[in-house]
Structure formats: structure tokens, C-alpha cells
């Protein structure tokens, strides 16, 4: 709350800029060369927005797929996706209408995206699509994926600590695309090696990983578990 007294406020904190991701470089090319990591709010969420904006205008990009859970009131993310669709890219958006407190906003954004020619998928019956992933299809085949623990939401990215990996790793990118295949064709037999995807295999694989560390400890080998979770 703002009580009107400057002496009761913390100094305004600004995100750290990453020198290798400055304005005069192609982020798509940088990601294709090496994985990039963003930790918001300590790093700027604008890097992700720049990736979408560049993809929307690039002649090398043929498609963009993304999941959306919560959106900012004046979402630059959606604006970039609409720009991409108007520039002839095939854009697919999976939007979760059951995002608590944001149902009405998500419906409004869905209509705007559909009007722009974006293929909008309203989740999967019986499941809630909570993942935050983006797949950018390149004409050269050097596709890119973004995997985030937080919403693609400019406001959230200024308050919540979240992690985002932007990668061109073929195995990871392929599996991110498989998640969209599963969403578009619900309950199709899709298996994952690189990603932990619920409700398919996540719980069983987590338990197996925990049991592995228990066995390591019992055998006198180094063992540890470090995990960051939002809810159990």
C-alpha cells in the first residue's frame, strides 16, 4: 500500500540487463547458438517479448505456438502474436479459460486473437493447461522453445520470481512441440524423455528420482535433493 510517505517506501528496483541480449542483436540467432536463461523479476521480461516481436516480423519464422494462462491488461505478448498472424505466420494459442479470477479477461483476449486469424484452443476437456511454453517454428528447421515457470504476463514478471529457458536444443524443442500435439489431439500416446509432463509421467518420475537419491545415500554416495515448488 502507498501511504504517501517516501521514507516508508523501498527504493525502486530495476531489472538487471543482460549485456549479451542487447537491442542491436537478433535474439533468435543468439538462442540458436546457445541456451539463454532469464530469471524474473531480476532479469527483464522484455527479452521474451522481444523474442516474440522478432519472430512476428522475421521471414525465417513460419509458426508460433504458445500457451497462455494469465495475461496483462494491455498484453504485449498478445499484440506480438496478433502481429505474427497478420504477417502470415501460423499462430496457435492454447488459452486456459479456467484461470481463476481471469476468466472474463481471457475470453476477451480469445475473441481478439480469433478475429486476427489466430487458431485458439480452449484447453483440454478434463484437464487444466497450466504449462507456460512457446514453440517457434523456423523455415530452416532450427526451431526454438521457451519454457517458463511463470505466466507470460508483464505484471506478474515484475513481482513473482520465475525462471525461463530459451533453447534450440533439438530434443527439448521436439518435446515441447509434442506437448502441443497432445493438447490438439487429447490423450494421444505421447512419451517424454527430456520434459516432465503431467498428468502423463511427472509424479512417477519425481518419485523415481527421489528414490534414486535415497539409494545413493544408503550406499554412501553423494545424495541431495534441491527443489523449488509452488504447491504440493
PLM ranges: what are they?
Residues 41, 228-231:
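Structural motif
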Amino acid at each position: 500500500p502507498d501511504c504517501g510517505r517516501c521514507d516508508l517506501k523501498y527504493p525502486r528496483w530495476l531489472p538487471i540487463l543482460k549485456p549479451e541480449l542487447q537491442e542491436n542483436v537478433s535474439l533468435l540467432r543468439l538462442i540458436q547458438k546457445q541456451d539463454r536463461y532469464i530469471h524474473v523479476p531480476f532479469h527483464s521480461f522484455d527479452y521474451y517479448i522481444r523474442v516474440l516481436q522478432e519472430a512476428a516480423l522475421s521471414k525465417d519464422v513460419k509458426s508460433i505456438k504458445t500457451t497462455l494462462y494469465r495475461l496483462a491488461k494491455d498484453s504485449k505478448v498478445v499484440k506480438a502474436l496478433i502481429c505474427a498472424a497478420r504477417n502470415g505466420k501460423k499462430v496457435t494459442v492454447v488459452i486456459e479459460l479456467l484461470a481463476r479470477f481471469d476468466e472474463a479477461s481471457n475470453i476477451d483476449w480469445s475473441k481478439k486473437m480469433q478475429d486476427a486469424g489466430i487458431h485458439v484452443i480452449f484447453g483440454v476437456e478434463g484437464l487444466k493447461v497450466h504449462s507456460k511454453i512457446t514453440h517457434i517454428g523456423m523455415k530452416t528447421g532450427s526451431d526454438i522453445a521457451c519454457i517458463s515457470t511463470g505466466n507470460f504476463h508483464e505484471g506478474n514478471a515484475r513481482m513473482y520470481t520465475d525462471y525461463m529457458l530459451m533453447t534450440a536444443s533439438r530434443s527439448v524443442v521436439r518435446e515441447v512441440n509434442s506437448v502441443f500435439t497432445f493438447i490438439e489431439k487429447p490423450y494421444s500416446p505421447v512419451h517424454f524423455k527430456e520434459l516432465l509432463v503431467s498428468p502423463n509421467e511427472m509424479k512417477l518420475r519425481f518419485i523415481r528420482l527421489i528414490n534414486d537419491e535415497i539409494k545413493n545415500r544408503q550406499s554412501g554416495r553423494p545424495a541431495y535433493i534441491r527443489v523449488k515448488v509452488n504447491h504440493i
